[in-house]
């Protein structure tokens, strides 16, 4: 009788211990699944937002194509006349100064090259940049794409023009100009504006202080476009300037769009995959462990039954 009571108590302790292990495994599994979600959600959101910006840029190009040729030519002509009226230079830094948005001059600016509130489209195929360009560098403009720096030439090209485009880096769910640091001399910048495609080849890359504006001034006889963003990441004490000079558009320019992929995305997906592989390994390991425990408990129960049978035989004897 004493042996039977001892065996029963031992079995209950074993079952209680197994139950606690299962609860711990369930909690840790939930935590690991949450970790996968935490790592993957920013990647998915960024990818979706990037594709949405690409869609807006594509929609702009389609809207321009639907305009009558005379209307497109009129937009280009008015933009060139606007550039001829520009002073030598406008605002020195898009993040430090802002224009009087209520002025007549600014309202005239907003009416230039305006197709569904979008001015143009910029592509840098080598690093996957494909973004709509908006008028000015307001918070709203820079939250949705690239801003054209008011006071610099409109994006219609021509000798003595220098257009400046700005965008953020380090946004939580948008790539924007994050990959501008990977652009190299010789890469191409394509501007799609009012039905024309202007090609620029990167010839100068520089980091400057916000007050150093001489490198974004126009030069006689030159046709430039400069892409600007804050650097270094997280500190934003300087500006990265990537300048391109106008070229005849070569046939080999890449046009196919690829959603930009960054190192942090690769790391996040890699960590999530490792966690998933660990969960799968542990699931198989737990199944084997549970199977061994069930077999052990079955043997113990069989041993108890045999022991009880022997005890009954002795008592009858």
Mark where each language-model region is.
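Acidic/Ser-Thr/Pro-Gly-rich, low-complexity N-terminal segments
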Residues: 1-20, 297-317
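Alpha-helical transmembrane segments
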Residues: 273-287
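Alpha-helical transmembrane anchor segments
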Residues: 259-272, 282, 295-305, 309-311, ...
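Core hydrophobic alpha-helical membrane-spanning segments
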Residues: 33-36, 270-277
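Solvent-exposed, non-transmembrane regions of membrane-associated and secreted proteins
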Residues: 16-264, 289-304
